[in-house]
Regions:
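Non-catalytic substrate-recognition and accessory regions of acyl/acetyltransferase enzymes
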Residues: 1-118, 126, 133-143, 151-154, ...
Length: 194
């Protein structure tokens, strides 16, 4: 693993903001460690209950897929896989490059659908903000896009503020959300990340 940056993470029990770390260059051992600690808590009924992060390793290193993890106190709090080779579908920015969030997941103890006692709050928001920062670093002006699981649609539209571009019939009927440069700049500024 390689430390990429520190990010703020809020501990629910005390409200304290702690410094967590985003790491890149994750390997099979890192993913197995995360999965083994998550598996006990991950509800099998969840839409993403079948995901296996260790299956993502073969696609890494292709130059377009990148995998990152958010760690605090030697424990993985969330994972995100991004693709760096996608373009916008929005009429206002059609064809412009952006970062595609292929998979994103908070540890089960950080998901309100998995537990009634959350450990940290905002893990998904932090990982999405990190994807926006990757987009800025790549010269894509912070633009990001993703297909949402049904249970997360309101999170992306209401909490993150992404634009809902409708159902993508070519991608399992999932809704397609995009965050433009002005939206991401506003989002990152509100959180003190730029």
């Amino acid at each position: 693993m390689k430390l990429i940056r520190q990010v703020p993470l809020k501990l629910v029990s005390t409200g304290q903001v702690v410094a967590a770390e985003v790491y890149g260059r994750l390997d099979m051992k890192d993913l197995r460690t995360a999965e083994s600690s998550w598996q006990v808590y991950r509800p099998k009924s969840a839409e993403h209950g079948h995901w296996r992060w260790t299956d993502k390793i073969p696609s890494l290193g292709s130059g377009t897929n990148e995998l990152y993890g958010l760690w605090h106190e030697n424990e993985c709090q969330g994972l995100i896989e991004v693709l760096m080779d996608r373009v916008s579908r929005s009429p206002a920015t059609l064809g412009q490059p952006l970062v595609y969030i292929n998979y994103i997941e908070s540890a089960p103890w950080n998901q309100s659908i998995s537990t009634s006692v959350l450990k940290y709050t905002g893990v998904g928001s932090i990982l999405i903000a990190f994807a926006m920062l990757l987009s800025r670093d790549a010269g894509y002006n912070g633009a990001v896009v993703l297909h949402s699981l049904t249970t997360a649609e309101s999170f992306y539209s209401q909490v993150i503020g992404m634009t809902d571009l409708g159902i993508d019939t070519n991608y399992d009927g999932l809704r397609y959300f995009e965050m433009s440069q002005p939206q991401s700049t506003s989002y990152l500024k509100k959180r003190g990340l730029i």
